[in-house]
Swiss-Prot record:
Matches recorded under HAMAP family: Fumarate_red_C
Protein name: Fumarate reductase subunit C
Alphabetized InterPro entries for the sequence: Fumarate_red_C, SQR/QFR_C/D
Disulfide bonds: none
Broad class of the protein's primary localization: membrane
Length: 131
C-alpha cells in the first residue's frame, strides 16, 4: 500500500558542526587525515628519488628545504601529534584491564603509550643519525 503522506525531513545546514565545540574538535581530528595523505605522497616521492640515484635524491632534499614545504611538514607533524593524543586517550576506553578486582584508570595506559612512542622515536633517531 502506498501513501501520499510526505515524511518530515528536518533541515540541516552545512555548518551544523560549527555549533558545538565537541563537533568542531571532531572535525579537526578527522581533518588530520589530509596532512597524513600529504606526508604519504611526500614519502613515496622520496623513495622514488632515492631509487633514481644521487641527482634525483639531491633534488628531493632541495625540495624538502623549501620554506613552504618546511611549514607544511610542521603542520603535518602537529596534526600527527594531535591524532596520536586523541588515539591514546581512546585506547583505555577500548581495553578493560582489571587489577585486584578493580578497573585500571586511563592514566597508566596513556602514559605507557606515550613512553613507548618516545622510546621508539629515540631509537629511530639514533639509528638514522648514528648507525
Amino acid at each position: 500500500m502506498t501513501t501520499k503522506r510526505k515524511p518530515y525531513v528536518r533541515p540541516m545546514t552545512s555548518t551544523w558542526w560549527k555549533k558545538l565545540p565537541f563537533y568542531r574538535f571532531y572535525m579537526l581530528r578527522e581533518g588530520t587525515a589530509v596532512p597524513a595523505v600529504w606526508f604519504s605522497i611526500e614519502l613515496i616521492f622520496g623513495l622514488f628519488a632515492l631509487k633514481n640515484g644521487p641527482e634525483s635524491w639531491a633534488g628531493f632534499v632541495d625540495f624538502l628545504q623549501n620554506p613552504v614545504i618546511v611549514i607544511i611538514n610542521l603542520i603535518t607533524l602537529a596534526a600527527a601529534l594531535l591524532h596520536t593524543k586523541t588515539w591514546f586517550e581512546l585506547a583505555p576506553k577500548a581495553a578493560n584491564i582489571i587489577v585486584k578486582d578493580e578497573k585500571m584508570g586511563p592514566e597508566p595506559i596513556i602514559k605507557s603509550l606515550w613512553a613507548v612512542t618516545v622510546v621508539a622515536t629515540i631509537v629511530i633517531l639514533f639509528v638514522a643519525l648514528y648507525w
